[in-house]
Amino acid sequence: IRCRVNDPFYMNTTSILAIEDGTVVGRIEYHFYGCMQDGYRMTYVDWVYVLPEYRHKGIAQGLFKKMEKDCNKHKMNQYYLIRATNPNADRFYKHFEDVELSECPILRKEIK
């Protein structure tokens, strides 16, 4: 990951780390983008992860709250992510307030 830190391509990405006793125990990564035509501003959450032994302690919720503060600071209209499809993730996201959960198919192609 060090080689990406100074790569201009990744400069619009933000990572917030949860650190306990000097150890990174969780991370959320996101970036902002918008539509020039209508000025709508969105945040895409690329990555959310908390080490298994630190889950169910409010760490992921705290990461999302910090991200939402950053979104408010930058006047973002909404954020979205592609949810993991596992029981733990489903339970976690169902506790969010004022969100729309949907089942959306995803097409992905690796560029070679």
Q: What is each model feature region?
A:
Residues Y93-C104:
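Conserved acetyl-CoA-binding loop of GNAT-fold acetyltransferases
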Residues V50, H56-K69, H95:
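Conserved acetyl-CoA-binding loop-helix of GNAT-fold acetyltransferases
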Residues I1-S15:
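Active-site rim helix/loop that mediates acceptor-substrate recognition in acyltransferases
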Residues Y80-D90, R108-I111:
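Conserved beta-strand-loop-alpha-helix junction that forms the acyl-donor binding cleft
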Residues S15-L17, T23-F32, Y44, Y49:
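Conserved beta-strand in the GNAT
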Residues Y33-V45, R55, L101-E103:
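A conserved beta-turn-beta hairpin within the catalytic core of GNAT-like acetyltransferases
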Residues F64, C71-A84:
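Conserved GNAT acetyl-CoA-binding A-motif
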Residues Y33, L51, A84:
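Residue-level recognition of the GNAT/N-acetyltransferase active site
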